[in-house]
Amino acid sequence: MKLLSNISMSSSEIIDVLCENLNDGIWALRVLYAEGAMNKEKLWDYINQYHKDYQIENEKDYEGKKILPSRYALDIMTARLEGAGLISFKAIGRVRIYDVTDLGNVLIKELEKRVEKNN
């Protein structure tokens, strides 16, 4: 197996890759950043509510579609964000409490800067 030791990326390039591939995961980061740590069921509800509020406010054509229509979609989203190191969880009994990691906070700050720069 050949190691990829000759590949180097700056932190800015890493953040760029994460931003480009975040997709709907931005909603989970946004919720956890704004509301703090929470369990998966609550996260699911909040993500759908935040997205609904955004659509009503910005697009004026909310059709009632949820961004995360199923628990399966939520599981995929949280697994992707965990794998990228953007969120983490603590198990309390059988409940997982999700929160934004330091890397997730760096990404959120970078996204905020980019939005301000584009406005």
Curated annotation (Swiss-Prot):
Although this has the same function as TubR of B.thuringiensis subsp. israelensis there is little sequence homology and the dimerization interface is different. Disruption phenotype: Increased expression of TubZ. Changing Y72A: No DNA binding. Homodimer. Binds to TubZ filaments via the C-terminus of TubZ. DNA is not required for binding to TubZ. A DNA-binding protein that is part of the type III plasmid partition system used to ensure correct segregation of the pBc10987 plasmid. Binds TubZ filaments but does not influence the GTPase activity of TubZ with or without DNA. Cooperatively binds to multiple regions in tubC (centromere-like site) upstream of its own gene with consensus sequence N(T/A)ATTNC(C/G)GNAAT(A/T)N; probably forms an extended DNA-protein filament. Binds sites in its own promoter region and presumably represses its expression; its effect on RNA expression has not been shown. It comes from the Bacteria. Induction: Probably part of the tubR-tubZ operon. This is DNA-binding protein TubR. GO terms for biological process: plasmid partitioning. Keywords: DNA-binding, Plasmid, Plasmid partition, Repressor, Transcription, Transcription regulation. GO terms for molecular function: DNA binding.
